[in-house]
Amino acid sequence: MAKNRFPGLGGGFNINQLQKQAKKIQEEIEKLQEELNQREIEATAGGGAVKVVINGKKEIKSIEISPEVVDPDDIETLQDLIVACVNEAIRKVEKMIEEEMQKVAGFGFTGLF
């Protein structure tokens, strides 16, 4: 009598079924990635003085700067606001991607994307 090599999986373990499920998850992830690439996320810094729009591919779509923060004598503050805003936008996109991928995969595949 053949011994069950995968006792934790039970006697009804079916590799073909597992492969079908993996393929289905992969297709769902690819579809979701396309959808996420089209989404746009907005982030602001300095109380809305700087606004960045970024898509799911982490491409900056636009940057808006309020004229009130443009001070030729203090370019450094404006630069800091832009950096903070871009970083916040990237963080938001990464969080969105992670949350959506977890819905599809149900576990930690997100490091792969």
Curated annotation (Swiss-Prot):
Keywords: Cytoplasm, DNA-binding
Localization (cell): Cytoplasm, Nucleoid
GO CC annotation: bacterial nucleoid; cytosol
Main location: cytoplasm
An annotated Gene Ontology molecular function: DNA binding
Keyword DNA-binding: yes
UniProt cross-references to InterPro entries, sorted A to Z: YbaB-like_sf, YbaB/EbfC
Highest taxon of the lineage: Bacteria
Subunit-structure text: Homodimer.
HAMAP family linked: DNA_YbaB_EbfC
Protein family per UniProt: Belongs to the YbaB/EbfC family.
PANTHER family: NUCLEOID-ASSOCIATED PROTEIN YBAB
Biological function: Binds to DNA and alters its conformation. May be involved in regulation of gene expression, nucleoid organization and DNA protection.
Official protein name in the record: Nucleoid-associated protein Csac_1593
Species the sequence originates in: Caldicellulosiruptor saccharolyticus (strain ATCC 43494 / DSM 8903 / Tp8T 6331)
